[in-house]
């Protein structure tokens, strides 16, 4: 399965290390590989890790984010902010924009992609705009039969989950946490750029977009 891990040195250092990014995921594949909901082999062409991180950055009296010479200097302030359970940022893979724009994840039409998503602290709701999850291994368990055709799936805090999707059309897809406040305002979003030929049998534009007229 896929599992979350995090630093746990003891006491208040546990949350401090975790909210400082000292966490991730590990994947252990079955000896015979993954199978779909019907028990047939399911092979992926690419696997991408989405490490979701909540950050709690302190601000000064003027509302600007504080800077510290070393991490331990900000420990007390960060822990105080974190007690409110309201993150200043929720990001993928370390920072806002880490997986968007020029840093977008890549793929091709016809490829199957496995997304591994972890969150050490908070619940998350992954969602692929323009697609969905063909298969979801709930709770990250590869020993269980995957569920199928999820629009949005769930990652409980302190766990990792895996989802697979076969891309059938080219274009830009957005993978995000479907708490849209966190996705749009706090940074929990990634881009997936898919190359290939458009398939009109899947979707066809019958009329070019134009102005909306009022009658």
How would you name each of these model-derived features?
Residues 1-215:
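Copper-binding active sites and cupredoxin-like electron-transfer domains
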